[in-house]
C-alpha cells in the first residue's frame, strides 16, 4: 500500500471501464497516457523513481462485463503540483482495449490526519501525565502562613505545656485538650491557646485561669467531659465550648471553630446544673441562674482593659436588648393557681396566659402580641418573622433546632414549658421555663 510517514497528499480516483480489465491495464494506462503530457518535471515514471509519488494502488471489480473501482496515488509534491497531476489523470479515456472514465473524488491532506492524531494524543497526555492541579496565589499564601503559625507553637511552665505564642500576654485564654488542638487553632489564627495534656490539670493552667478570662474548648465526648469536670473544680473557668457531635477540635474547620466559640456557655450557669451521673455535653440547660451569677461573669469580662489576643473576626457577644437581662425564674405553684390575666402586659403574664393552651404566642419588644399560632405553624413561620419580634412563648417542649432558629432570627428570649436536648445556649438568647 503506502506509508503516511513521508507523503503529504493522497489522490482518490474513481475508475469505470466499459469491459473487463485488469490492474496492470489500469497502471499501464496511467503511465502511458500521461507520459510527456506534463513535461519532464512531472513525468510519473521519474517521480516514482525519485520517491515523490508512491505506488499506484488499484482496487477494481469486474461484474456484468464492466469494471469499476478505486485507485489511490500517494504524493509528496506540493499542493499545486499534486492538483496538476490529479487533473492530468482525468484525461485518461481508455484502459486496455476498453473505453473508460476516470474521475478524481478528492485529494486528502494526510498532514491534517497527523494534526488530528497529535491533538487527540496531546489531550490524552494532558489528562494522564499532569496530575497536579494548578495552585492559586491564595493557596500558596495560606500554606505559607499556616506553616509559619505551626512553627510558632511554644511551651510554657515547668510542665512544658503546648501553647500559642500569645497565651502569656493575652487577657483571655482558651484551654484545649492536646497539642494537636493547639496546632489546629493556630492554623485558624487563634494563638492564645494552651493544652492541659491529660485529665490532671497542671498548676500552670490553674494559675493562668485565675488571672485571665478563660474559655474551655473540649471535645463533646467522655474524655472532654472528664477534663471539663476537673477544670470546673480546680480552675477559674468563665466559659465552656464544645466541638460538634462526633468531631474533635483538632479536626474542625475554621468556620466550625468560630461557631463553637460563639456558642460558648457561661461556666457559672453550667456549674449549677451538673449532675455527677450525667455527661456535661448532654446537659439540658434549664436556665435558672440569678442576676448575681450572670452579672459576676459580665463584671470579670468588663474589668479587662486590654483587648484579648484572639482573631479580629471572632464574633463579639450580641448587643444587649431593651429587655432586662435577668433570667426569669420558673413560675411557682402559687403563681400557677392565679387566674389568667385578661390583658397580659408582661412576659410573665403572657406565659401564665398561654399555659395549658398547647399553643404559642409571638411578642414584640414592648410585650405586645403579634400573633398566636399552633406549634407547627410557629415552626413554619419562624424564619419569616419580621425584625420587630422580640421573643416567643411556646406551651410545649422545644429542642436545640428550635433554639438555633430563634437565635438566627435575632430573638432575645424563648419561653417554653420544657427544653429538651439543649446542649448549648447561644449567647444573648434567654431561655425561660414556665
Swiss-Prot record:
Primary role: RNA polymerase that catalyzes the synthesis of short RNA molecules used as primers for DNA polymerase during DNA replication.
Keyword Transmembrane part of the UniProt annotation: no
Biased composition (Basic and acidic residues): 292-303
Protein name: DNA primase DnaG
Subunit structure comment from the entry: Forms a ternary complex with MCM helicase and DNA.
Alphabetical list of InterPro entries matching this protein: DnaG_primase, Primase_DnaG_arc, TOPRIM_DnaG/twinkle, TOPRIM_dom
EC number: 2.7.7.101
Positions that bind Mg(2+) 1: 177, 219
Substrates-to-products reaction catalysed: ssDNA + n NTP = ssDNA/pppN(pN)n-1 hybrid + (n-1) diphosphate
Reported cofactor(s): Mg(2+)
Cystine pairings recorded for this chain: none
UniProt keyword list: DNA replication, DNA-directed RNA polymerase, Magnesium, Metal-binding, Nucleotidyltransferase, Primosome, Transcription, Transferase
Record domain Toprim: where: 171-250
Top EC category: transferase
Co-factor binding details: Binds two Mg(2+) per subunit.
One cellular component (GO) term of this entry: DNA-directed RNA polymerase complex
Annotated region (Disordered), positions in chain: 290-319
GO BP terms: DNA replication, synthesis of primer
Amino acid at each position: 500500500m503506502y506509508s503516511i510517514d513521508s507523503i503529504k497528499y493522497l489522490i482518490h480516483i474513481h475508475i469505470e471501464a466499459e469491459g473487463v480489465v485488469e490492474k496492470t491495464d489500469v497502471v499501464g494506462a496511467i503511465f502511458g497516457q500521461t507520459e510527456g503530457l506534463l513535461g519532464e518535471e512531472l513525468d510519473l515514471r521519474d517521480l516514482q523513481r525519485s520517491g515523490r509519488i508512491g505506488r499506484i494502488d488499484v482496487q477494481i471489480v469486474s461484474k456484468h462485463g464492466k469494471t469499476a473501482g478505486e485507485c489511490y496515488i500517494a504524493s509528496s509534491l506540493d499542493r499545486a503540483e499534486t492538483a496538476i497531476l490529479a487533473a492530468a489523470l482525468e484525461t485518461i479515456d481508455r484502459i486496455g482495449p476498453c473505453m473508460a472514465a476516470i474521475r478524481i473524488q478528492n485529494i486528502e491532506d494526510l498532514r491534517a490526519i497527523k494534526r488530528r492524531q497529535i491533538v487527540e494524543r496531546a489531550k490524552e497526555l494532558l489528562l494522564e501525565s499532569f496530575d497536579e492541579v494548578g495552585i492559586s496565589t491564595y493557596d500558596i499564601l495560606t500554606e505559607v502562613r499556616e506553616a509559619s503559625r505551626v512553627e510558632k507553637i511554644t511551651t510554657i511552665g515547668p510542665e512544658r505545656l503546648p501553647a500559642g505564642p500569645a497565651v502569656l500576654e493575652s487577657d483571655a485564654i482558651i484551654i484545649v485538650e492536646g497539642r494537636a488542638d493547639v496546632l489546629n487553632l493556630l492554623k485558624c489564627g487563634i494563638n492564645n491557646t494552651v493544652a492541659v495534656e491529660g485529665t490532671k490539670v497542671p498548676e500552670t493552667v490553674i494559675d493562668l485561669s485565675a488571672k485571665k478570662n478563660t474559655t474551655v474548648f473540649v471535645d463533646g465526648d467522655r474524655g472532654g467531659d472528664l477534663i471539663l469536670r476537673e477544670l470546673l473544680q480546680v480552675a477559674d473557668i468563665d466559659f465552656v465550648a464544645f466541638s460538634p457531635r462526633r468531631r474533635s477540635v483538632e479536626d474542625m474547620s475554621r468556620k466550625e471553630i468560630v461557631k463553637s466559640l460563639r456558642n460558648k456557655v457561661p461556666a457559672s450557669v453550667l456549674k449549677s446544673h451538673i449532675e455527677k451521673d450525667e455527661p456535661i455535653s448532654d446537659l439540658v440547660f434549664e436556665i435558672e441562674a440569678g442576676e448575681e451569677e450572670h452579672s459576676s461573669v459580665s463584671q470579670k469580662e468588663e474589668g479587662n482593659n486590654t483587648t484579648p489576643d484572639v482573631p479580629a473576626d471572632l464574633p463579639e457577644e450580641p448587643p444587649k436588648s431593651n429587655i432586662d437581662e435577668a433570667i426569669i425564674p420558673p413560675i411557682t405553684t402559687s403563681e400557677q393557681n392565679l387566674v389568667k390575666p385578661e390583658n397580659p402586659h408582661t412576659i410573665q403574664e403572657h406565659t401564665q396566659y398561654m399555659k395549658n393552651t398547647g399553643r404559642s404566642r409571638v411578642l414584640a419588644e414592648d410585650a405586645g402580641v403579634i400573633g398566636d399560632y399552633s406549634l407547627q405553624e410557629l415552626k413554619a413561620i419562624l424564619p419569616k418573622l419580621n425584625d420587630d419580634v422580640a421573643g416567643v412563648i411556646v406551651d410545649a417542649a422545644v429542642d436545640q433546632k428550635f433554639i438555633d432558629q430563634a437565635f438566627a432570627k435575632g430573638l432575645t428570649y424563648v419561653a417554653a414549658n420544657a427544653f429538651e436536648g439543649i446542649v448549648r445556649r447561644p449567647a444573648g438568647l434567654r431561655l425561660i421555663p414556665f
